[in-house]
Amino acid sequence: MSDLASEGSDPAERASEHSNGNAPADRPARRSGDQAVADAAERAKATGSRNIPVLPDLPLPEDTANLRLGPDLSPAMLALLPMVGVWRGEGEGNDPARGDYRFGQQIIVSHDGGDYLSWESRSWFIEADGSYGGPDLRETGFWRVGVDGDDEVIELLLTHSSGIVELFYGTALTQSSWELATDVVIRSQSGVVVGGAKRLYGIVEGGDLAYVEERVVADGPLEPRLSARLQRYIG
């Protein structure tokens, strides 16, 4: 387990703290359950009627990023249900060549009723003045849920535009937080050289999706690489 998995008691809150720079001691008082439900209903007024575009005339079930629309979610994917949607926001990155930087990001998590979730993430650099600074990272893949004895195993298969293919395995730490680590990293002939990684995702205060990625750099220890807090745009 990474250090992220040993700090504090709530993995989702830890992901949020790493993504916005707040210390654990700065946490606000917890809201009541009724207030959380009311806030979620208010957010759904803006996001609940949206969905991703789908090209017509295919005999297949349509992809949907909105659990209110399209095919029912497969029971096999209930452990990942809170992730379904489109998420947009900003984060902070650290690259050995570039140093610290800000980025914008959109993540699309959709399904077609099958026993997997589709995943697409695109990010872009944000300049010091807040302007667009060019494309950054792009990845696409699938989430699956396997079984190891009596335990569920979260699987994440990713292909990166940088020429990397990764297989992550992990677990659901709570009903709304998940931790994964790479089991295999494959580089194409033209791909960049990277080490293994760990990721922690969580649904945090306000219904946002927060995450932290740590990655091995130059055969060294795990180091913070990416963190972001994204707001729901669809779903």
Swiss-Prot record:
It comes from the Bacteria. Residues 1-59 are annotated as: Disordered. InterPro entries: Calycin, Nb(III)_bact/plant, Nitrobindin, THAP4-like_heme-bd. A motif (GXWXGXG) lies at residues 85-91. Belongs to the nitrobindin family. HAMAP family: nitrobindin. PANTHER family: PEROXYNITRITE ISOMERASE THAP4 (PTHR15854:SF4), THAP4 PROTEIN (PTHR15854). This is Ferric nitrobindin-like protein. It comes from Nocardia farcinica (strain IFM 10152).
